[in-house]
From Swiss-Prot:
Disruption phenotype: Shorter roots, slow growing and reduced seed set. Slightly reduced male transmission and retarded pollen tube growth. Complete inactivation of pollen-specific transmission due to abnormal pollen tube growth in plants lacking both EXO70C1 and EXO70C2. One of its GO terms (molecular function) is phosphatidylinositol-4,5-bisphosphate binding. The gene is EXO70C1. Phosphorylated. Pfam families: Exo70_C, Exo70_N. GO terms for biological process: exocytosis; protein transport; regulation of pollen tube growth; regulation of root development. Interacts with ROH1A. Binds directly to B1L. GO terms for cellular component: cytoplasm; exocyst; nucleus; pollen tube. It comes from Arabidopsis thaliana (Mouse-ear cress). Residues 1-50, 159-190, 432-456 are annotated as: Disordered. This is Exocyst complex component EXO70C1. Belongs to the EXO70 family. InterPro entries: Cullin_repeat-like_dom_sf (IPR016159), Exo70 (IPR004140), Exo70_C (IPR046364). Required for global plant growth and for male transmission. Involved in the regulation of tip growth of pollen tube.
């Protein structure tokens, strides 16, 4: 293993410390070494190691203070490399992690020899004995750090294997719960995020406190010895491999741009759902857990740059794969049904940012850029809805004046879209800001003030889009209503569609909040106007034939005119009943309101006309010939209207 260039950095750090304070620290380490040596060791070897350590401290202190050091080395100091070398051999046989006390003794010895080597290199003494001792100590130090590096990697990998075993056991015991969770995820596009505290608890169970403590000591010893690059490389390789296994186990292999473009939307929907699930797991479990692990293994304040570099490297390698996939999805052909998956992906990347905020800013910018592209695609897709409304110009009217399929599709689409209200508002607001920034501003009035004065900008960006879609739908329905030759049916069509729209808005808190009360009141007013127009077109002429004007000639009721009036009423009412019983008013409340309003308009007028003029007709066959309906019959036949089923009057009578 080659020693890294970080040795120079370690030297600079050492120079910043006062020699006396470090010597005092060395004394303390020697005392700790003395007290922490296992009782099973012989008394002579215990004292020998402590004496050697103290002799080394004194030796370094002497060399540092004398102006012209002779470079004489005592037997105790001379034996120090060999003593550490023996510890290395012992640890190579037993390995770290078996005895915490022995681990501490070994790591303290490595720290001591590393500091000794670094101090002597700083002094640059021209002494053959010192040079010889330094060469031997350097060789032992390299061997010791190599062992630490090997143990470091082994401990990281062993913990990963234990994690896999624990996960497999958990999956075996909790299989039914897992199946339930998976089915729930498949039933809904929108994943349920895990609680943050649960995420942290799950993320750290694979490393025991003892393992964390040992990893921390090894990392500190390697970095102090000038082997920061080697330590970081081992850590990063192990954790990257762990992440690769994790992603493979949950089924994320990643597909390239060509694959995304080639597969059908149904298959791609499944890939997107898996992507969302995995990225959210990274956001809530894996990345926070990785940050916690990194902070635990490299806790020193001096290691902040190490922590950031390692965390950034790890999350970048994983996140770039996620962003490649989202970038490929953005390039697929746009269509309205894709909006909600795009918004799911947008939200997923938005929620990923807090999990990587401790990483390099460049990575965060990459995520934001990918998020922006998804947002722009969502805006374009939403625009497809507007295009579909404009282009729906069929010339065949919907039978019976029923709710048009375009109305149903648009309102259901908007209802679902409003479940993403906050996200869509954020998307459109960001899009409008970018569009405005890219356009020249010819007005001298400040743009913000202009917007504040504009009523349109008092609602949210997404609300403005909703209003625009509703205006387009209204205009399209108005055109479609003109396809009906019967003006009465035209107003039934407008009432049906208007009522459907209003009920959808009232049934959705999100849409109602976006559209506002004034818009809803305006829609209700339009419905009442359609209702009045229908009454005027359908029943105006019926009421006219029951008018008293023209019935009297020279002060007497003209029987021929009266008979004609009854005939006209019968014919008109028969035709209305025959025709409008086949029409559909799908909303039961509106159907009832229409029948009640017709009854209140027609029945009193007919009862009055019937009661006043029936006596002027000859009784018997003449009366039955011209008076076809009793007043109570009128109410019964009105109740047949708007059911969508033709009714035989003769059969009913």
């Amino acid at each position: 293993m080659e020693k890294s260039g970080n040795h120079h950095h370690a030297n600079e750090s050492s120079e910043n410390h006062d020699h006396k304070s470090e010597d005092h620290e060395n004394k303390q380490h020697s005392d700790e070494l003395h007290s922490s040596t296992p009782e099973s060791q012989s008394e002579s070897s215990e004292h020998s190691l402590v004496e050697v350590m103290e002799a080394v401290v004194d030796f370094i202190q002497t060399l540092s203070s004398e102006k012209d050091p002779l470079g004489e080395i005592s037997p105790a100091v001379e034996s120090f490399p060999e003593a550490v070398d023996s510890l290395v051999s012992k640890m190579e046989s037993s390995g770290l992690g078996r005895d915490e006390t022995e681990d501490s003794v070994f790591i303290d010895a490595v720290n001591r020899i590393s500091k000794s080597v670094m101090r002597l290199r700083e002094l640059k003494l021209d002494s053959t004995p010192v040079s010889s001792w330094l060469n031997r100590a350097s060789s032992v130090q390299h061997r010791a750090v190599s062992l630490l590096d090997e143990e470091f990697r082994h401990l990281l990998d062993r913990s990963r294997e234990e994690e896999k075993k624990n996960n497999n056991n958990n999956n075996h015991h909790d299989g039914s719960n897992s199946d339930h969770n998976n089915s729930s995820t498949n039933d809904s596009d929108r994943c349920v995020l895990q609680d943050h505290e649960e995420a942290e608890e799950e993320s750290f169970h694979d490393f025991s406190p003892e393992s964390i403590s040992t990893l921390k000591k090894i990392a500190g010893a390697m970095i102090s010895a000038g082997y920061e690059a080697e330590c970081c490389m081992s850590y990063e390789m192990s954790r990257r491999h762990a992440f690769k296994e994790e992603l493979t186990e949950v089924g994320f292999e990643g597909i390239n741009v060509e694959d995304v473009q080639r597969i059908g939307w149904e298959s791609l929907e499944g890939e997107i759902a898996s992507w969302i699930s995995i990225v959210r797991r990274c956001s809530t479990v894996l990345f926070p857990g990785e940050l916690s692990l990194c902070n635990a293994v490299f806790p020193d304040q001096d290691h902040s740059s190490v922590r950031k570099r390692l965390f950034t490297g790890l999350v970048s390698a994983v996140t770039i794969r996620f962003l490649d996939f989202s970038g490929a999805v953005v390039l697929t052909k746009r269509s309205s049904e894709k909006l909600f998956k795009f918004l799911d992906m947008y939200e997923t990347l938005r929620d990923l940012i807090p999990a990587v905020e401790q990483s390099d800013s460049d990575l965060i910018q990459e995520i934001k850029l990918a998020q922006t592209r998804l947002g722009e695609a969502a805006v374009t897709i939403f625009g497809e809805l507007e295009k579909s409304i404009k282009s729906d110009n069929g010339r065949t009217p919907v039978p019976s004046g029923a709710v048009h399929p375009l109305t149903r599709y648009t309102m259901n689409y908007l209802k679902y879209a409003c479940e993403y209200k906050e996200t869509l508002d954020q998307v459109f607001q960001h899009y409008e800001a970018n569009q405005t920034d890219n356009k020249p501003e010819p007005e001298t009035k400040p743009r913000q003030q202009q917007r504040e004065d504009d009523e349109e900008y008092k609602v949210s960006a997404f609300a403005r889009q909703m209003i625009r879609v509703m205006e387009l739908l209204d205009a399209n329905l108005e055109i479609k209503s003109r396809l009906y030759r019967d003006p009465s049916l035209r107003f039934i069509f407008l009432m049906n569609n208007g009522r459907y729209i209003l009920q959808k808005i009232k049934g959705s808190i999100e849409i109602r909040d976006l559209m506002g009360q004034s818009w809803t009141r305006k829609r209700s007013t339009e419905l009442r106007q359609y209702h009045k127009s229908y009454q005027r077109e359908t029943w105006g002429k019926v009421l006219q034939c029951m008018n008293q004007e023209g019935l009297q000639v020279n002060g007497k009721v003209s029987k021929p005119v009266l008979k004609e009036r009854f005939k006209i009423f019968n014919a008109m009412f028969d035709e209305i009943h025959k025709t409008q019983s086949t029409w559909i008013v799908s909303d039961e409340q509106m159907q009832s309101e229409l029948r009640v309003s017709i009854s209140s308009l027609v029945i009193p007028a007919y009862r009055s006309f019937f009661g006043r003029y029936k006596q002027h007709l000859d009784s018997g066959k003449q009366t039955d010939k011209y008076v076809k309906y009793q007043p109570e019959d009128i109410e019964s036949f009105i109740d047949d209207l708007f059911d969508g089923n033709p009714t035989s009057m003769a059969r009913k009578r």
